[in-house]
Curated annotation (Swiss-Prot):
Pathway: Cofactor biosynthesis; adenosylcobalamin biosynthesis; cob(II)yrinate a,c-diamide from sirohydrochlorin (anaerobic route): step 6/10. Its EC number is 2.1.1.195. Belongs to the CbiD family. GO terms for biological process: anaerobic cobalamin biosynthetic process; methylation. Keywords: Cobalamin biosynthesis, Methyltransferase, S-adenosyl-L-methionine, Transferase. It catalyses: Co-precorrin-5B + S-adenosyl-L-methionine = Co-precorrin-6A + S-adenosyl-L-homocysteine. Signal peptide: none annotated. It is an enzyme of class 2 (transferase). This is Cobalt-precorrin-5B C(1)-methyltransferase. It comes from the Archaea. It comes from Methanopyrus kandleri (strain AV19 / DSM 6324 / JCM 9639 / NBRC 100938). Gene3D superfamilies: CbiD-like. GO terms for molecular function: cobalt-precorrin-5B C1-methyltransferase activity.
Length: 409
């Protein structure tokens, strides 16, 4: 068997291609693929790098080992949210309180201003139990005043420090810092999301996917080769996981990274597979409000550098459902779009999301001559909402009845 499943994308990776292109033996190729550090997009082998969250976790673990065991480590093993374990190199350990630093590696084809940035963690004992996580200089602050450290990263740090906390019976305070964070943040789009004072510490899966246009298009076309029924376009790992929980098979889920233009063109024109051209006449789109508001407005490339019509689309959609009063509030709202959406009455929010799904289905069907089903995923406080368009309901029923989605030869 020359294929292993990519733990991030859930599709086969050609081990022989990896071994040949990287000039490594087969066990090394297996390790690189199993950890998620290496993936492929057709004939190309691509390297993933750790997220800011994984680097922060590695720094915290190295600092905690020095504090509790008196050892200085140069590499630490970090468990990723996806479940695999990778080694991360530590650039410096020392200080009082104990501090460690990681210089963030990059990934192939990924234009990322955080590549090469230093991420530091200070660790101190506390009188309480568990792990307390704080933000220091260079880590941004959200409009609500909270540190811009995602929940997934917080869970990753706690998961990787748990054995030390349990073994030594202590509580730990971890402070994450990015010495050049404020300067780097000026080069990012953080301010558009209301993040001030530094960068966000993020990472849903723990590894950064390559995302140049060439790499994204290659990844989309590679994923489409394995689709058995209807391609379900998602925009990231959060929507990918949620789509799986809705019952969409992993092989049918395609991460388009917000590039609906590239994905829909590939779905329509087809991709080479087993000596034939695999085409589809239907597509599912599953996303969160930010991306789908843009898509409803006709922005098929939803990257923030290209299109940021979320607020305008939100205002228009509210008018369309007969709530001009809320449209005015949305136009004046200075915080995050997600915060405004959480403030809405649940019934109004559902009506709004149904309208967004309806527009996406109509637009994609009209512009690309594809039967389209759209569903929207939203997290409101501690609960989750999934709103399905009529096209989605029809196509997913067909899934169950084995009526639709078979690729056309």
């Amino acid at each position: 068997m020359n294929d292993l499943l990519d733990p991030i994308r859930g599709i086969p990776v050609d081990l022989e291609l990896v071994r040949r292109e990287l000039d490594v033996d087969l066990p090394t190729a297996r390790y690189l693929v199993r950890t998620g550090l290496i993936t492929t997009d057709g004939a190309r082998v691509l390297r993933r790098g750790p997220t800011t969250g994984t680097c922060a976790t590695a720094a915290a673990k190295a600092a905690a080992i020095r504090l509790l065991e008196g050892r200085t480590v140069r590499t630490v093993r970090v468990r990723l949210p996806v479940g695999t374990v990778i080694g991360v190199r530590i650039s410096r350990v020392g200080g009082d309180p104990s501090e460690a630093r990681v210089r963030k590696p990059g990934s192939d084809d990924h234009v990322d201003v955080t590549t090469g940035v230093t991420i530091a963690a200070r660790v101190e004992e506390t009188g309480s139990e568990g792990v307390e996580i704080r933000a220091g200089r260079g880590v941004g602050e959200t409009p609500s005043g909270k540190p811009a450290i995602s929940e997934a990263v917080r869970e990753q740090i706690v998961d990787n420090l748990r054995y030390l906390v349990d073994s030594y019976g202590v509580g730990l305070r971890v402070t994450i810092e990015v010495p050049d964070g404020e300067e780097i943040a000026r080069k990012t789009l953080a301010h558009r999301h209301g993040i001030e004072g530094g960068i966000s510490i993020l990472g849903t899966k723990g590894l950064v996917d390559p995302n140049s246009e060439e790499a994204i298009e290659g990844s989309i076309r590679s994923d489409l080769r394995y689709v058995e029924r209807v391609p379900c376009l998602v925009t990231g790992y959060r929507t990918m996981d949620r789509a799986r929980r809705l019952g969409i098979p992993s092989r049918d889920i395609v991460n388009c990274h917000g590039r609906y233009d590239l994905a829909l063109e590939a779905v329509k024109t087809g991709v080479p597979a087993d000596g034939e051209v695999k085409r589809f006449d239907a597509v599912l789109i599953f996303g969160m409000p930010g991306k789908l508001l843009k898509l409803a407005a006709g922005a098929y490339n939803t990257h923030a550098k290209v299109a940021d019509a979320r607020r305008e689309s939100l205002v228009t959609r509210l008018v369309e459902i007969g709530r001009p009063d809320l449209a005015v509030e949305a136009a004046r709202h200075e915080g995050l779009i997600s915060e405004f959406l959480r403030s809405l009455d649940p019934d109004v929010r559902r009506e709004l999301f149904e309208r967004v799904c309806e527009l996406v289905e109509e637009r994609v069907s009209s512009d690309h001559d594809l039967e389209c089903g759209c569903a929207l995923y939203f997290r409101a406080d501690d609960s989750e909402e999934v709103v399905e368009g009529e096209g989605w309901k029809r196509l997913v029923r067909g899934y169950d009845d084995d009526l639709i989605g078979r690729p056309k030869g």
